[in-house]
Amino acid sequence: MNKKYGTSSNNHDNKKDKKNNADKNKNKKNTTTGEENKDSNKSLVNNDSKKNDSSKNKYNIVKANIKNIFASDKKNEKSDKNEKNESSKSSKNTETYTNVNDKKSNNLITKGSNDKKKKKKDSKKNSSNNNNNNTIVDISDGDYTNDEEGTNKPKRNWKGRTFSRFTPGGVRSSTVLFICTAIGVGFLSIPYVFSKLGIILSIILIILNAFESYVTTNILCTSSLEHNTFVYGNLLKKIGNKYYKTIIDFGLSFGFVSSYILILILISNFLSTIFYVFNFPTLFTNNVFLVILICLLILPITFRNKVGSLNHFLIFSLFSLSITVLTIGLQTKSYNNLLINKEVNLFKMDKHFFKCFNILLFSFSQQPNACFITGQFNQPTHRRLNKSTFRSVILQVIFYTLFGILGYFSFLNTAKDNIVLNYENSNVSILLCKFLLSLTFFFSVPLNFMGSYQSMLALGITTRDALYKLYTYIFRRTGYSANLSLLLSEYTNDPYQETHADNITEHSSVSESQTDDQNQRMWISVIVTIFCALIACKVKKLSNVIGIGGGITSTLISCLLPNLIYYKNRHNVSNKLKRYSTLFMLCFFSFMGFLSVVVTTLNLIL
């Protein structure tokens, strides 16, 4: 009997050892498959990151990993079940054979416990391998391939965003467009404002005008997006009626003409001084000759219909303005020491207040090109437009405040309406600033022409129609009426009619003004240039032109008409305090603008 039990127990031990060895081999296979899966996943991810494949490869890797996870989970479940069955069998076998041989049973128990520990460790390793497989695959928005750069591009740091190349229609390029639209001839009259009003009152008016410019620019940009039109006149026509469009067309046209005249006066004065100092022929010191020469150089640039072609010139304009501020700042102390009366005014109120108010209002007038820039914007969302307008206004405040304070402390109460005229002609650094400013104002003309071209075209069509009506009224009883009817029938399809794309969405970068015929643009540019050149040869006083002409256009375009647009859409603003405070502010600036024009005109007459 003992022999039988001994042989049976030995056979049982041999079978159990075989099972244990088989289980170990299975666990080794599981671990090796897990490690192979891990290595394969790592290699896949590394290859994906190196080659920058499309986003589909990432999702395929994720699916493959998920399948591997489920497969390994099933294997782990099977191994756990086998462990339980084997443990139950081993416990039963040890209980039945304890009376036969205690030493062998103790050895079996210790072996079973050690096997269980090893199996648990192996299962933990498999689970950790699966977890590692999950963390290796990167499905976040950190890195993207070239196919995804347009939509889900990772954010770069501020250095990469600031010093990277300008993209047409981007936030930075649109900010530069707003700044170059606003900073014009009025920039040189800021120290004159400080000398007449004092430092504190001038800074207060700068902040108030900056806030008004920010609010009205946002009103125009958001209204252009909502009504899907990027021409100022068409926006007012949709909101109001055709008479509103005529008013804004006149305002934009008059504003461009007045700024064009001022720029021709300034550039001719600057260049004549430079040519005189460097002993050029007397022909180049003649203002009339210089005005004609400048107009001939400006004309070809105004024929362009895309803002992107002017990006490099506009960036150079900001550079030249910065050089001018630095040059005047470095010479402030030396010129201040030459003054006899060094009394500094902090707050001053006199008859010059209204003219200075209009100069500052004109200096922040970036609204004429607001709709046009919105049409040129790439992905014109409210957040991106708000960011661009806010940055442009902040930079204008910094420029005007620094330039006004530095120019005022250089000459105090003797500052002229054009601060550059206070410097002697022998100052080489100021001559360099004059040349840089001439280039800045030169390239601002085609930019402003792009924004006001549609208005001048529409105003020309309105004038032509009025002349046709007058013609029919005078000759309606004569035989000329029949010829006129034939003439009018040829214009049923108006060749000058403005064409604009109605299918432009919020994410479109196509402007309505880009579809016009090139010949119309050339004719209007030539006619307006000749008209401005004739006036520029006669007018010399700068501040009076800004105070009257700039005051009318700035008040009309920057205050009154945005106020009308905001009043039409006032129900879209749920907060009543914000609604009525904005209306009050716009009404106040509209009233002050027109009052300043009247007072400035009366001061000149009387």
Swiss-Prot record:
It comes from the Eukaryota. Residues 12-25, 72-89 have a biased composition (Basic and acidic residues). GO terms for cellular component: membrane; vacuolar membrane. InterPro entries: AA_transpt_TM (IPR013057). Changing residue 541 to N: Might play a role in the evolution of resistance to quinoline drugs in southeast Asia. Keywords: Amino-acid transport, Membrane, Transmembrane, Transmembrane helix, Transport, Vacuole. GO terms for biological process: amino acid transmembrane transport; amino acid transport. It holds the Pfam family Aa_trans. Residues 140-149 have a biased composition (Acidic residues). GO terms for molecular function: amino acid transmembrane transporter activity; L-arginine transmembrane transporter activity; L-glutamate transmembrane transporter activity; L-histidine transmembrane transporter activity; L-lysine transmembrane transporter activity; L-serine transmembrane transporter activity; L-tyrosine transmembrane transporter activity. It is a multi-pass membrane protein. Changing residue 162 to E: Increases resistance to chloroquine. Its main location: membrane. It is found in: Vacuole membrane. The chain crosses the membrane at residues 175-194, 200-225, 246-271, 283-301, 313-332, 352-372, 393-412, 428-449, 522-539, 545-567, 579-605. Changing residue 454 to E: Might play a role in the evolution of resistance to quinoline drugs in southeast Asia. Residues 1-156 are annotated as: Disordered. Belongs to the amino acid/polyamine transporter 2 family. Can transport antimalarial drugs such as chloroquine, amodiaquine, mefloquine and quinine. Putative amino acid transporter. Probably transports tryptophan. Involved in maintaining the osmotic homeostasis of the digestive vacuole. Important for the timely development and growth of the asexual-stage parasites and male gametocyte maturation. This is Putative amino acid transporter AAT1. It comes from Plasmodium falciparum (isolate 3D7). The lineage of its organism: Eukaryota, Sar, Alveolata, Apicomplexa, Aconoidasida.
